[in-house]
Amino acid sequence: MCLRLGGLSVGDFRKVLMKTGLVLVVLGHVSFIAAALLHGTVLRYVAAPNDAVALQYCVVDILSVTSAIVVITSGISVIVLSRYLPSIPLRWTVFSSSVACALLSLTCALGLLASIAMTFATQGRALLAACTFGGPERLALAPDCPFDPTRIYSSSLCLWGISLLFCVAESVFAVRSAQLAYQVLELRPWLGKSSHRMMQESPEPVEDPDLPSRTSSGPMTL
């Protein structure tokens, strides 16, 4: 008897779950670091409740941090599922957390894309609001400017681009994780069934008892 899950043996399926969980954990940590760097180097200077663009920057950064934490949690649950595969509550936990992770990462990616577009549209004026000089065409390191204005524009776009790539990757692997959890939950609603067989028995030759055995006999003489 050969047990198969989604065309893979149980051992191979556990390995796929383990690798997917590890990738989610790594992506979540890197995305969290990128969001923390963005807040520490840029957004802590431009947080202004009366500025809609700066407020949108901060909301997207908070969303990025939240998404990274959810991704890490989802990756850990996938790794645990690879060890305790028969647990039904754990399967549902992985499935629900993976779906939430995919939606949150996709929302985060759209928010980061909007931040990049608004930065290009406004030429980074919201990033330079803490400085007193007139505009980005007069960039100079002034004593009353809390950061280097010559680098904040490129640094922000670079960190936003990195975070955007990682959010897209997180959503892809979260969908993959949800697909794997969907397979072990044995849900096939489009077939009109709540469960399907994932155990396939290898065919074995069986002798028919009603089939007479033919033995060689000598010639009959009358």
Curated annotation (Swiss-Prot):
- Outline the segment boundaries, as ranges, of region: Disordered: 198-222
Q: How does it sit in the membrane?
A: Multi-pass membrane protein
Q: Where is the composition biased (Polar residues)?
A: 213-222
Mainly localized where? Answer: membrane
Q: Which InterPro entries match?
A: Beta-casein-like (IPR020977)
Task: Give GO cellular component annotations, separated by semicolons.
Answer: membrane
Pfam families listed in its UniProt record: BCLP
Compartments, record wording:
Membrane
- State the UniProt keywords alphabetically: Membrane, Transmembrane, Transmembrane helix
Where is the chain membrane-spanning? 22-42, 62-82, 100-120, 155-175
Family membership: Belongs to the TMEM54 family.
Q: What is this protein called?
A: Transmembrane protein 54
Gene that produces this protein: TMEM54
